[in-house]
């Protein structure tokens, strides 16, 4: 488990490229036949990837010991989105078939979660939970899509809301998938911050010769991190989170905090950015 401490905005603005990477970048999300796990002190979110290829991968009691509990989800809820091929997720003996871009919400209290496939790649977010909501599969046909932006401003994109109150109940975790239209490069511009929650972006569906310049920092102290395919970046509440790519791309967003209202944002005008 890779533990990342919280960081003050005044400290963050003094960091060089490697310092920003150490604090915010999750460089390797997927490892064959393993799970990866980054634990952030910011709202206690856990992010990572699960990639069963030649054997099943389980997340259970061994993780619980690192969290001070008996098993991983004793006090947590889990959200996963599959960006690879078909696979299965077995939650306490109940098997769910998970296809490409299917998602699964696993409620607090599930003792054993087992992942199996030959070519799946499952990205996950995990957050503290105060009560148990039912485990539920969400398919792309069941999400709440919204198309925003314009080709003229190169930010035409479709936001697919998987885990939001309109689709299912969670304690605090929200997740979704945003896909840029061909030829569009910008996400979340004009940008915003979230005073009441943090966010993690996971960039994927990118060619090897492409990258995304992820914008972060306070609106008047912006910095950037160069993101490559299948990498994630942590965004504290005080930071903007936007990006521009060399080609169109897709990203999964996950939010944790005290408010699940999607539009609860502190907007920043482009003219006010520095």
Swiss-Prot record:
Q: In which pathway does it act?
A: Glycan metabolism; pectin degradation; 2-dehydro-3-deoxy-D-gluconate from pectin: step 4/5
**What GO biological process, any one, is recorded here?**
D-galacturonate catabolic process
Cofactors required: Zn(2+)
The note on the cofactor says: Binds 1 zinc ion per subunit.
Cell membrane: present as a keyword of the record? no
Q: Which UniProt keywords apply?
A: Isomerase, Metal-binding, Zinc
Reaction catalyzed: 5-dehydro-4-deoxy-D-glucuronate = 3-deoxy-D-glycero-2,5-hexodiulosonate
Which HAMAP family does this entry report, sorted A to Z? KduI (MF_00687)
What is this protein's record name? 4-deoxy-L-threo-5-hexosulose-uronate ketol-isomerase
Which species? Shigella boydii serotype 18 (strain CDC 3083-94 / BS512)
Q: What is the lineage of its organism?
A: Bacteria, Pseudomonadati, Pseudomonadota, Gammaproteobacteria, Enterobacterales
Q: Which gene encodes it?
A: kduI
């Amino acid at each position: 488990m890779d533990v990342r401490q919280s960081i003050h905005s005044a400290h963050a603005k003094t960091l060089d490229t490697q310092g920003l990477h150490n604090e915010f970048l999750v460089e390797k999300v997927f490892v064959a036949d393993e799970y990866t796990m980054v634990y952030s002190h910011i709202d206690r979110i856990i992010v990572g990837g699960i990639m069963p290829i030649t054997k099943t991968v389980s997340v259970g009691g061994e993780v619980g010991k690192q969290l001070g509990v008996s098993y991983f989800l004793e006090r947590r809820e889990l959200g996963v989105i599959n960006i690879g091929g078909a696979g299965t997720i077995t939650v306490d003996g109940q098997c769910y078939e998970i296809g490409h871009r299917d998602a699964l919400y696993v409620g607090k209290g599930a003792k054993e979660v087992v992942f199996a496939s030959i070519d799946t790649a499952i990205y996950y977010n995990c957050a503290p939970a105060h009560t148990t909501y039912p485990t539920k599969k969400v398919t792309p046909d069941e999400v709440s899509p919204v198309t925003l932006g314009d080709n003229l401003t190169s930010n035409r994109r479709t936001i697919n809301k998987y885990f939001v109150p309109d689709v299912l109940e969670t304690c605090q975790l929200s997740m979704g998938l945003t896909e840029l239209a061909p030829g569009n490069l910008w996400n979340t511009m004009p940008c915003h911050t979230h005073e009441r929650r943090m966010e993690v972006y996971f960039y994927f569906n990118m060619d090897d010769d492409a990258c995304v310049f992820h914008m972060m920092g306070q609106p008047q102290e912006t910095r950037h991190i160069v993101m490559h395919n299948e990498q994630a970046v942590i965004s504290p509440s005080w930071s903007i989170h936007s990006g521009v790519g060399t080609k169109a791309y897709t990203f999964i967003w996950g939010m944790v905090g005290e408010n699940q209202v999607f539009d609860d944002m502190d907007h920043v005008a482009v003219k006010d950015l520095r």
